[in-house]
């Protein structure tokens, strides 16, 4: 086999060290990829695949991209889940002896992408490190574009997920044990597009982690960083820092502090609730428009947008912190002119955090510094406007905001007003800042003038009237004197060449000019680059001041946005309490009211407490507004704890520790779960993790299964929640099981509410108003009419409902099948009916007994013949859980049936739970089998 060429050998050796990356190998003005990397990159980037002689018998697959366009291509690969290793030329090819020296200068991963052009400026790009142990889990999260760095510890899988969903990192790096902690890691990768990889063994060594953190923060003990009680968290923080050093190959000087926190400081919102409440994006379109953040975010800066997003994603549970935010918003609304002036200045501030990150990474260009200085020029105005504020948070922002006028002055003096993007092309340094730059720049542009002046001066001094300053590539610049004036040549001139009719000379002054003119451009570009790098480094040394100021700007922007939205949307300042009462008057959905015209949104009251108003059972037809009402209540509570004003005429909010929602029903095809399985998984999570201080929003529990099972589950869930020794949480419970309305008065704390509906003949009008009492109709056919269901279907539905509304549901269902079979059907549906696949279903013996006891129509022989799993017509009506008086009074067709009815009559249904009812039915079934 032929030998590889020296260059290709260098490539192969480098690639061997970065097997999990696509290697961008710098060759002149291009980054080239070879072999397998070329095959992958050409496909993913849609670029031409070629070949290159590599010294072997076959040409190596090759593709390439221009170096100046690399960031866009890198971001594409990162977005597709790849890692990219950037291998640069680290010596001047002109000076290289042999193969140019190359090194990997950075590894780009989803969590370490520095390309601010492709990152969403309104959200952080987090990298998360997770160390899982049997007792605790350490979690550290960092955004290297802003310098944010956090650490915490949690106890169980659910809390790990809560932190993941809160930060939504682009990348997770973990220890191998994390893959065995019971979480669906593949789901994180596939559904949430989070890149997940493991640390190497040495990364999560605890001693190494402590050492890494101490060295980075230059401290002798981690206690001063607040990390004393975070042993596993320190492990995660150190591991993620080592990972960054290894991939970024940079000092990471902008990671100036680490923030430890306890998760109990914030309200817990699980992933389902975040999606269902549409906090930052809509459920279907995954867009910001239509979310709560869309309503609240009227920030002017990228920093403010990220800060406000963090407010929404991490509601507070401490009254003092929340009240402080209210005070800031109140003051900004009391001083509208001040607020709007601040917002106007904020409009001209660039992303200081990410600009600072680029400066620290030495990737900032001259235009970045101009944007930075332009932003700093706004700070004195904002600081002055804040100087008169009295609320605690606004005073704190004023104190923490540094005008940074020294840095602004440095940039204004040194950097040209309209510099190029490149840093090695000159034109960066402002005239008058550096004498040598001015001289070189003058030499580059005024060299001919200097030569003409020298020529005139020498002519005058020597009397050589035909003296000329000339140039050629061999001798450079020289003074040419004809032989007729040779006697006038000064002794200090140096002869360079003798011609037949002339002599050529040089002088020290001409040599100096020659040096300036010929080397001016190269020296100028090099000097300007050095000066720019020096200025950039000077700014980087002030990273702590800049980051502190950037956070102050972000906070005032977020509060000004909340104040502006509160005023524009007529939000009010809520009151807070610790007794658990939620009292909302004329509450409105903050998003829906913005989506409908002319103030048509109907407001509603809500009252929940820890005593007799714990659970509200809400009934009413679909489309009437049950889900909107429940979501609006949850959002008002959440907004109150975010520190925002709320859409209501009055609100007194008891602090809740968690908000859980079970809203909607859909199959989770990605993870192979059915509608009902998704529903029950979420219900199980709620019942296990909610506390008496939680707020539960439950919509249509049990609708994903059969009527009887669904009703039983819904009933049992309400019993569990209402029991103060088990849970006792405040709950809004929407249902179509109207039988559940009978729980009011039977279970403590349960109250009935419904959506008011106005009937107009066969039509209905949804009044959208919550009123006391339970609904007596579902208005399903009327809703179907509103949805545009064909009239023929509606007519047939009315016929069926009239039949099913009578007590003999099971018997009538048989006739419905027959009626359907003889109706006008399409050939396709006709075939389904003829094979009994449309209107029949398997039911078990318990369902058969339940149905037939209710109707008291089937004799003993029929019961016995149907006690095993059999084909039965599907019951299209809502099966009644309660045995009617009419059923009890009917006579059985046999002596055994009569005894059965007598026994049923003795049931104390009013005090019987669903589980007890099922046990009774099981006992009856055994009697029937025994009798046969």
Swiss-Prot record:
<dbReference type="GO" id="GO:0140664">
    <property type="term" value="F:ATP-dependent DNA damage sensor activity"/>
</dbReference>
<dbReference type="InterPro" id="IPR045076">
    <property type="entry name" value="MutS"/>
</dbReference>
<comment type="similarity">
    <text>Belongs to the DNA mismatch repair MutS family.</text>
</comment>
<dbReference type="Pfam" id="PF00488">
    <property type="entry name" value="MutS_V"/>
</dbReference>
<dbReference type="InterPro" id="IPR007861">
    <property type="entry name" value="DNA_mismatch_repair_MutS_clamp"/>
</dbReference>
<dbReference type="InterPro" id="IPR007695">
    <property type="entry name" value="DNA_mismatch_repair_MutS-lik_N"/>
</dbReference>
<dbReference type="Pfam" id="PF05192">
    <property type="entry name" value="MutS_III"/>
</dbReference>
<dbReference type="InterPro" id="IPR036187">
    <property type="entry name" value="DNA_mismatch_repair_MutS_sf"/>
</dbReference>
<dbReference type="GO" id="GO:0030983">
    <property type="term" value="F:mismatched DNA binding"/>
</dbReference>
<dbReference type="InterPro" id="IPR017261">
    <property type="entry name" value="DNA_mismatch_repair_MutS/MSH"/>
</dbReference>
<dbReference type="InterPro" id="IPR036678">
    <property type="entry name" value="MutS_con_dom_sf"/>
</dbReference>
<dbReference type="InterPro" id="IPR005748">
    <property type="entry name" value="DNA_mismatch_repair_MutS"/>
</dbReference>
<keyword id="KW-0067">ATP-binding</keyword>
<dbReference type="Pfam" id="PF05188">
    <property type="entry name" value="MutS_II"/>
</dbReference>
<dbReference type="InterPro" id="IPR007696">
    <property type="entry name" value="DNA_mismatch_repair_MutS_core"/>
</dbReference>
<dbReference type="GO" id="GO:0003684">
    <property type="term" value="F:damaged DNA binding"/>
</dbReference>
<keyword id="KW-0547">Nucleotide-binding</keyword>
<dbReference type="InterPro" id="IPR000432">
    <property type="entry name" value="DNA_mismatch_repair_MutS_C"/>
</dbReference>
<keyword id="KW-0238">DNA-binding</keyword>
<keyword id="KW-0227">DNA damage</keyword>
<dbReference type="InterPro" id="IPR027417">
    <property type="entry name" value="P-loop_NTPase"/>
</dbReference>
<protein>
    <recommendedName>
        <fullName>DNA mismatch repair protein MutS</fullName>
    </recommendedName>
</protein>
<dbReference type="InterPro" id="IPR016151">
    <property type="entry name" value="DNA_mismatch_repair_MutS_N"/>
</dbReference>
<dbReference type="Pfam" id="PF05190">
    <property type="entry name" value="MutS_IV"/>
</dbReference>
<dbReference type="GO" id="GO:0005829">
    <property type="term" value="C:cytosol"/>
</dbReference>
<comment type="function">
    <text>This protein is involved in the repair of mismatches in DNA. It is possible that it carries out the mismatch recognition step. This protein has a weak ATPase activity.</text>
</comment>
<keyword id="KW-0234">DNA repair</keyword>
<feature type="binding site">
    <location>
        <begin position="620"/>
        <end position="627"/>
    </location>
    <ligand>
        <name>ATP</name>
    </ligand>
</feature>
<dbReference type="InterPro" id="IPR007860">
    <property type="entry name" value="DNA_mmatch_repair_MutS_con_dom"/>
</dbReference>
<dbReference type="Pfam" id="PF01624">
    <property type="entry name" value="MutS_I"/>
</dbReference>
<dbReference type="GO" id="GO:0005524">
    <property type="term" value="F:ATP binding"/>
</dbReference>
<dbReference type="GO" id="GO:0006298">
    <property type="term" value="P:mismatch repair"/>
</dbReference>
